[in-house]
């Protein structure tokens, strides 16, 4: 089953961006290559139950089993040792990526309280967009009664474009709600 956002990208966004950016080849048009979702857990070392609930929540949100990220070396100031669980991470590609991006744009972001749009300064200079969410309740897959604690997550949308302007044009064409469109 092809995703709705993927067919919209192929049929509408690609011809529009090809004309705007004046590319000769259709493969030069920027595209979303992957989405990385990271959820850091400070209390995972003391509470194994929080790690399990975060794994469950992230698998509900993404539809894919997350991996547990571990500390590379010991840091006494944070009271962690090497190989201790410090977070949960998921990398989405292909159809799962388009399904998540569609739900993020059309379901999750409009449910944020006092949402004014995404900040267009959150690009990293290489065409990748980063956003942070403060709670997981905005996703319809999460049941309010079954969560133990509100946890935020970092979402990185990696594009094939080499600069921020092309990536911003791509995400605006896909429907991402930015505060000021195309000011980069």
Swiss-Prot record:
Record bears the keyword Plastid: yes
GO biological process, one term: translation
Gene: rpl5
Domain of life (superkingdom): Eukaryota
Subcellular location: Plastid, Chloroplast
Family named by the database record: Belongs to the universal ribosomal protein uL5 family.
Organism: Zygnema circumcarinatum
Residue ranges of coiled coil: none
Disulfide bonds listed in the record: none
Protein name: Large ribosomal subunit protein uL5c
